[in-house]
């Protein structure tokens, strides 16, 4: 062996020499800190959702305001829409657009009156029904 190799082996060790590490096959038991669960981190989600529930009343004047209504539904707010100030064709387009929005968030849309609708996201539950007593021919022909 050359002097260089001897010096290298002295400081670096022999390249064929391996270190053996004795490993215990015993599994380590978890410490108390790991096993202990902090009960203060548990939050009841239903109470969080109920505290932020809102109902928004909107009376659109044209189809362009449908996006604002849809944004409220996507943000998990119930919306009551009064379509009395919109002509029938635009009102029908608004209802169609909102029906798609409500479907996307797994919500519900209900007719409350002749030109009034309630759109709710999935976090709002509506109970009860409203029935119309008299049907005027004009309202019946609108095709809601």
UniProtKB/Swiss-Prot annotation:
Keyword Translocase assigned: no
Localization annotation: Cytoplasm
InterPro entries assigned: Cell_div_SepF, Cell_div_SepF/SepF-rel, SepF-like_sf
GO process terms (BP): division septum assembly; FtsZ-dependent cytokinesis
Predominant location: cytoplasm
An example Gene Ontology CC term for this record: cytoplasm
Record key words, sorted: Cell cycle, Cell division, Cytoplasm, Septation
Function: Cell division protein that is part of the divisome complex and is recruited early to the Z-ring. Probably stimulates Z-ring formation, perhaps through the cross-linking of FtsZ protofilaments. Its function overlaps with FtsA.
Record note on quaternary structure: Homodimer. Interacts with FtsZ.
Family that this chain belongs to: Belongs to the SepF family.
Protein name: Cell division protein SepF
UniProt source species: Oceanobacillus iheyensis (strain DSM 14371 / CIP 107618 / JCM 11309 / KCTC 3954 / HTE831)
């Amino acid at each position: 062996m050359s002097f260089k190799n001897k010096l290298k082996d002295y400081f670096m060790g022999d390249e064929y020499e391996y270190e053996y590490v004795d490993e215990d096959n015993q599994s380590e038991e978890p410490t108390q800190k790991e096993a202990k669960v902090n009960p203060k981190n548990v939050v009841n989600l239903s109470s969080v959702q109920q505290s932020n529930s809102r109902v928004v009343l909107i009376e659109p004047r044209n189809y362009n305001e449908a996006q604002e209504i849809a944004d409220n539904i996507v943000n998990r707010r119930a919306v009551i829409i009064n379509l009395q100030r919109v002509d029938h064709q635009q009102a029908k387009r608004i209802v169609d657009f909102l029906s798609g929005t409500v479907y996307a968030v797994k919500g519900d849309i209900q007719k409350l009156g002749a030109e009034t609708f309630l759109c709710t996201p999935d976090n709002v539950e509506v109970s009860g029904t409203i029935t119309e007593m008299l049907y005027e021919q004009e309202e019946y022909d609108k095709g809601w």
